[in-house]
C-alpha cells in the first residue's frame, strides 16, 4: 500500500506535468510508473530525481542492459520489491535473458554471503586492495 496518493495526470502541478512530459518523450511512451506518480507530490524532488536518473542511466561506458542489471543487483541488496520488478523488466527489455538473470542472481547471492562473512569475521583489508 502506498504511503502517498499516486497522482493522476489531472492532479499534477504544472512543474510535475513538465517532468512527466520529459519522461514520456525520453522513454518514447505514454506510460508513467508509480514511482514517478508518488514523487510528483514534490515537483522539485521529482525534477531532481529524474534529471539525475537521465544522466546516470543515459549513454556512457556501460551498456543500457548492464546498467539495468546493476540497478537490479542494488535493488535486491536493498530489498526493494518494486525496484526489483521494475529493473528486471527493464533489463529484459534491453536484452537480458534467463541465463543472464540466473547468473546475476548467483553473483548477488554469493556477494551477500561473502560480504556478511567478511563483516562478521572482521577480516582486515589487504594493502594491495587499497590502491
Where would I find each of the regions flagged by the language model?
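Hydrophobic alpha-helical segments
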Residues: 1-131
Amino acid at each position: 500500500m502506498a504511503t502517498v496518493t499516486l497522482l493522476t495526470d489531472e492532479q499534477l502541478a504544472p512543474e510535475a506535468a513538465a517532468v512527466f512530459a520529459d519522461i514520456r518523450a525520453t522513454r518514447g511512451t505514454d506510460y508513467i510508473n508509480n514511482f514517478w506518480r508518488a514523487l510528483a507530490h514534490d515537483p522539485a524532488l521529482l525534477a531532481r530525481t529524474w534529471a539525475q536518473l537521465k544522466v546516470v542511466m543515459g549513454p556512457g561506458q556501460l551498456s543500457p542492459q548492464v546498467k539495468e542489471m546493476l540497478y537490479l543487483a542494488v535493488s535486491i541488496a536493498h530489498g526493494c520489491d518494486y525496484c526489483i520488478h521494475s529493473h528486471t523488466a527493464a533489463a529484459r527489455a534491453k536484452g537480458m535473458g534467463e541465463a543472464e538473470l540466473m547468473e546475476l542472481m548467483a553473483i548477488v547471492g554469493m556477494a551477500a554471503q561473502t560480504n556478511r562473512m567478511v563483516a562478521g569475521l572482521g577480516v582486515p583489508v589487504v594493502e594491495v586492495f587499497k590502491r
